[in-house]
A protein has these predicted regions:
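A hydrophobic, multi-pass inner-membrane permease signature
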Residues: 1-288
Length: 288
């Protein structure tokens, strides 16, 4: 009786996981098929929509990089290459700022116990919605001539994601045995050398995980980029929202194609650090 009950519970658990996976995959599948549909298929009524494209085409991708669509006979002034470069530059630099500063601050708090109230203060900053302070930030950025610049957007990305990087890395540093660092200090290493040569290699996997999470946060941001950019440095989410014409309305096919392209950098980054990702997610889960 117990074996049968265990079997039913296990089967039910796997069915729930399967159902959740299918529900999660539906938008991805729909976006993928929409990206390869010709314009008449996604501009027609809802009763004519289908899962698979009847006449697959690359016209939506061509439209993004040329600004013209032969089948729709429309054109846009700005192609997708500029926003893609802007997103890549700003998200990368913002991640570099947040992870570098967050890692150094987390190590200092974890090991030297400086700023006892600093972790709680940083957590409170993270819980505070960034958009609530965007008006004074916009005034400050305008005064410093940082509106619609790569440096201005990268800097605010680094500031907003810094608390997240700090708390992740502080948790990981707390799980590193202090005895190893003390042994290195006894051998004559300076604290900076201990951090660089001993501690940092031990948290390489958690560091890779933090980089991935922070990059995804910066890469997918819409609200901050919408407020702090105008034309030259708009990002992919802002550009995607602007993909519409007076003749056709929303360019759903082009938006789906852009969504597929926008998913490539996080996926590539995840593949590059996949050997560290699982270890980083489970770092410190087991205690000796």
């Amino acid at each position: 009786m117990m074996n049968r009950r265990s079997f039913l519970l296990g089967a039910g658990r796997y069915l729930l996981i399967l159902l959740a996976s299918v529900i999660a995959l539906i938008p991805i599948v729909w976006m993928t098929t929409m990206a390869f549909k010709p314009a008449p298929e996604w501009t027609s009524g809802i009763e004519q929509l289908s899962w698979l494209p009847r006449e697959p085409t690359l016209d939506n991708f061509r439209f993004l990089f040329t600004g013209r669509s032969a089948k729709l006979l429309v054109a846009i002034d700005r192609i997708a290459l500029g926003p893609m470069i802007s997103s890549l530059v700003c998200a990368t630099l913002g991640t570099l700022i947040a992870v570098t500063v967050g890692t150094l601050a987390a190590y200092g708090v974890s090991r030297f116990r400086v700023g006892q109230n600093l972790p709680l203060s940083i957590l409170q900053l993270r819980l505070f919605p960034p958009l609530a302070v965007m008006i004074p930030v916009m005034i400050m950025w305008a005064y410093l001539h940082l509106i619609d610049t790569w440096w201005g957007l990268s800097l605010i990305y680094g500031i907003v994601t810094l608390p997240f990087a700090f708390w992740l890395m502080m948790t990981f540093f707390d799980d590193v045995p202090r005895e190893i660092e003390e042994a290195a200090l006894v051998e004559g290493c300076t604290p900076w050398r201990v951090f660089r040569r001993v501690t940092l290699p031990m948290v390489k996997a958690p560091l890779a995980t933090t980089i991935l999470f922070v990059f995804i946060l910066n890469w997918s941001d819409y609200a901050i980029a919408l407020l702090l950019t105008r034309k030259d440095w708009i990002t992919i989410p802002v550009y995607m929202n602007a993909l519409s014409t007076a003749m056709t309305g929303q360019m759903y096919g082009a938006k789906a194609a852009l969504g597929l392209i926008a998913a490539i950098p996080p996926i590539v980054l995840g593949i590059l650090i996949q050997k560290h990702l699982v270890r980083g997610l489970t770092f410190g889960a087991l205690k000796q």
